[in-house]
A protein has these predicted regions:
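C-terminal region of N-terminal signal peptides and the immediate post-cleavage residues
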Residues: 22-40
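A cross-domain feature marking catalytic cores of carbohydrate-active enzymes
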Residues: 88-90, 115-117, 142-144, 183-185, ...
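Acidic-and-aromatic substrate-binding clefts and catalytic sites of carbohydrate-active enzymes
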Residues: 91-95, 116-125, 149-153, 182-188, ...
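CE4/NodB-like, metal-dependent polysaccharide N-deacetylase domain
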Residues: 105-112, 139, 155-187, 223-238
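His/Asp/Glu-enriched short active-site or ligand-binding loop at hydrolase and phosphoryl-transfer sites
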Residues: 187-229, 261-273
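Catalytic grooves of carbohydrate-active enzymes
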Residues: 231-267
């Protein structure tokens, strides 16, 4: 019976997603629609994490958090376990930001968004996204203000990119992103890391697997990447840029559930720094 209910839920999720975002395109609708029509002024949750309506495992307890590893970029979750960190970058397309946020709200999946504040999607979707940020279900990380190759910039420009985005996140969402920053294109070096460290961004956060959707690709290829990289202790990168990924949400959630993976934010895994 529970399996039938879950299948009905995912079926309605798929139908609503298609109805909302339509066929794949590279432009944003003048009035973006969510794929599940719910009030945007819902209060943030507090206390214990509510059970997932699709049977996803809850995040680990606070007592399970571990110290951040030192000595370089973070690419996987240390140790053995059942954790999956789905991390999503940029925010080019407001519809995709909205759809991923609604997916999290509807399923209980936990995610980390690495934000480029230059994109309007982060203010367009503020009312929907902020309660999930405040509850800790979605974490925000610093991906720089405008997505430059940091290794091509002067130290002052690197500082400007990180500080401007940091200030945007604090002003808009009331949260800081430290210590996690993701260098655009994964490109960083000692000089970049030194500037970031001075600002409190001590953890360059890369990945162990990718949905490869920074550019427009097919739904079939995204499903192939999900199958390959949704594995225990992985940090997977995806992008909030193009619509095909929004058409495969039911399969994405099914893979997480069927493999008994536990979606986590980075803050769910690691002890917070002072």
């Amino acid at each position: 019976m529970e399996e039938m209910k879950r299948r009905r839920f995912l079926g309605s999720l798929a139908a609503a997603t298609v109805a909302a975002v339509g066929t794949a395109r590279l432009i944003v609708d003048p009035q973006p629609r969510t794929f599940a029509q719910v009030p945007l002024d819902a209060a943030p949750t507090s206390g214990p994490v509510a059970p997932s309506p699709v049977g996803l495992l809850p995040p680990p307890p606070l007592s399970a958090r571990i110290p951040l590893p030192g000595g370089g970029a973070l690419t996987t979750i240390p140790g053995d376990g059942d954790l999956l960190a789905l991390t999503l970058d940029d925010g080019v397309n407001s519809d995709v930001v909205r759809a991923y946020t609604q997916l999290a709200k509807d399923t209980g999946a936990r995610m980390t968004f690495f934000v480029n504040g230059i994109y309007n999607s982060w203010t367009d979707n503020l009312d929907l996204l902020r309660p999930l940020v405040e509850s800790g279900q979605i974490q925000l990380g610093n991906h720089t203000w405008s997505h430059p190759d940091l290794t091509s910039l002067t130290q002052s420009k690197v500082e400007e990119e990180l500080k401007r985005n940091d200030e945007f996140l604090k002003k808009t969402y009331g949260v800081g992103a430290k210590p996690y920053y993701r260098p655009p294109y994964g490109k960083h070096n000692g000089a970049v890391d030194a500037v970031a460290n001075e600002l409190g961004y001590t953890v360059p956060t890369l990945w162990s697997g990718s949905l490869s959707d920074s550019t427009l690709i097919t739904e079939e290829y995204i499903l192939k990447m999900i199958d390959e990289y949704f594995v225990p202790q992985a940090i997977v990168i995806g992008h909030l840029n193009h619509l095909p990924v929004t058409h495969v949400y039911p399969q994405l959630i099914d893979t997480i559930r069927d493999r008994n993976l536990r979606t986590v934010t980075l803050n769910d895994v690691f002890l917070r720094t002072p």
